[in-house]
């Protein structure tokens, strides 16, 4: 979720051809009374058995039965590569009709997208906190499709072995507990500041000290005193040996897998960590739990909430608008939202689906955190800022936090 947004670079020929094949330019355009829609979606699966391709092709087949004149071609792209590949496709004017993944604001700025109200009958059913995030200059273009929130996962067996009797509430608790776990030969706290999702891990720690990427007025505050102090703390946490070595080179998914193997005591995670734990076959459901994330002086009252968006491209004028609307109305039914969430351990984006899952023992605690969730900045400058965060913020825990954060702040101010 909130996926890799690197600067547009030359991708492999295979990647470009893959999206070119999905483009609705040229041979894939509609013919006669029939319509062909091309959907490019991020793959959230952990392998062939639960690839997102299977999910979307199932919806496409059901939809085609109900609407024989409309065919939906499905292409899924590795979650980590989605943004780069879509950007390359758009740059080459090979537009998909519908995308489901991350990142919409630059395309809205360029006038390439339909508004939500133009391609969905009931956009009011989308969760308000994320609908607002999907807006650009007062109009909604990004349609939240799947959401997630963050909690602190910890290994109860390692806690017991280390003599820890309760979940950490503060940063001091985190450090003390992590060092006790380290003394037992395991990694105390997993700190993924590598390129996969450093922007998310960083924000969780910023929030713990009253910081953020922006303040309430919308001013960039990346190098604020609070954030510098946060990374000074993390630098000390790393140097103490409480984390894995070199967090700036460690990606979230890799550390999640180590947690699932019982090698890490604590790590910040989302519901997407649960299937990794289940597939690891090392930790039973009673061996781990999740709780609110510890802040400097107490647990976070609001955590990071993220969502991935559907975007509908104005591909070939308005000739496909009605077909896109039919498909999105179909795909956003509660049964498909719930199916997606249970398959990939993510959260719904519609109010009706969230209500149906509120009492679910797995999803309930995460859904409870969503209404107060904090999101990433939604303006177009965030694309460049996020890339720099992913590439450099890990060096703040081994070098000079003030300098590293100041460089990112300069990028944000220059873009704004």
Locations of the language-model features?
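Conserved C-terminal helix/tail region of periplasmic/extracytoplasmic solute-binding proteins
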Residues: 160, 239, 365-416
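Extracytoplasmic "Venus flytrap"/periplasmic binding protein-like
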Residues: 62, 66-128, 160-162, 169, ...
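Glycine-centered hinge/linker elements that transmit conformational signals in sensory
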Residues: 178-182, 219-248
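Long, aromatic- and glycine/proline-rich binding clefts that accommodate carbohydrate-like moieties
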Residues: 288-292, 340-388
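Conserved N-terminal structural module of periplasmic/extracytoplasmic solute-binding proteins
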Residues: 2-105, 295-298, 403, 411-416
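Extracytoplasmic/periplasmic substrate-recognition and gating elements
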Residues: 162, 239-243, 279-343
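Extracytoplasmic/periplasmic solute-binding protein
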Residues: 141-144, 150, 172-221, 264
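Hinge/lid segment of periplasmic solute-binding proteins
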Residues: 102-149, 173-175, 201-203, 208, ...
């Amino acid at each position: 979720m909130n996926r890799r947004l690197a600067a547009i670079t030359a991708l492999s020929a295979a990647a470009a051809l893959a999206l070119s094949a999905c483009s609705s330019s040229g041979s894939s355009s509609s013919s006669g009374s029939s319509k062909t829609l091309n959907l490019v979606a991020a793959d959230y699966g952990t392998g062939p058995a639960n690839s997102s391709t299977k999910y979307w092709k199932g919806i496409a087949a059901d939809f085609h039965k109900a609407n024989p004149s409309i065919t939906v071609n499905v292409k899924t792209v590795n979650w980590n590569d989605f943004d780069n590949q879509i950007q390359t496709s758009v740059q080459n004017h090979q537009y998909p009709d519908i995308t489901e993944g991350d990142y919409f604001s630059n395309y809205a700025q360029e006038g390439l997208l339909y508004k939500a109200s133009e391609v969905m009958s009931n956009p009011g059913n989308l969760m308000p906190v994320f609908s607002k995030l999907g807006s650009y200059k007062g109009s909604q273009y990004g349609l939240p499709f799947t959401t997630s929130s963050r909690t602190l996962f910890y290994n109860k067996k390692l806690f017991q072995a280390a003599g820890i009797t309760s979940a950490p509430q503060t940063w001091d608790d985190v450090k003390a507990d992590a060092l006790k776990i380290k003394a037992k030969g395991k990694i105390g706290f997993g700190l993924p500041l590598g390129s996969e999702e450093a922007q998310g891990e960083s924000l969780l720690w910023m929030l713990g000290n009253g910081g953020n990427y922006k303040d309430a007025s919308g001013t960039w505050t990346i190098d604020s005193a609070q954030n510098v102090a946060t990374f000074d703390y993390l630098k000390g946490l790393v140097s103490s040996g409480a984390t894995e070595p070199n967090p700036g080179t460690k990606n979230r998914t890799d550390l999640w897998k180590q947690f699932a193997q019982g090698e890490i005591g604590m790590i910040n995670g989302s519901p997407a960590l649960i299937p990794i734990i289940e597939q690891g076959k090392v930790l039973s459901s009673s061996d781990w739990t999740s709780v609110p994330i510890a802040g400097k002086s107490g647990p976070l009252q609001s955590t990071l909430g993220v969502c991935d968006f559907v975007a509908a491209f104005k591909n070939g004028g308005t000739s496909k608008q009605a077909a896109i609307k039919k498909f999105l109305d179909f795909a956003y039914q509660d049964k498909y939202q719930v199916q997606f969430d249970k398959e990939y351990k993510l959260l719904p984006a519609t109010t009706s689906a969230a209500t149906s899952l509120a009492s679910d023992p797995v999803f309930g605690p995460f859904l409870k955190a969503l209404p107060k969730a904090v999101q990433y900045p939604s303006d177009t400058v965030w694309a460049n800022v996020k890339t720099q965060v992913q590439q450099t913020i890990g060096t703040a825990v081994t070098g000079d936090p003030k300098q590293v954060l100041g460089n990112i702040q300069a990028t944000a101010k220059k873009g704004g």
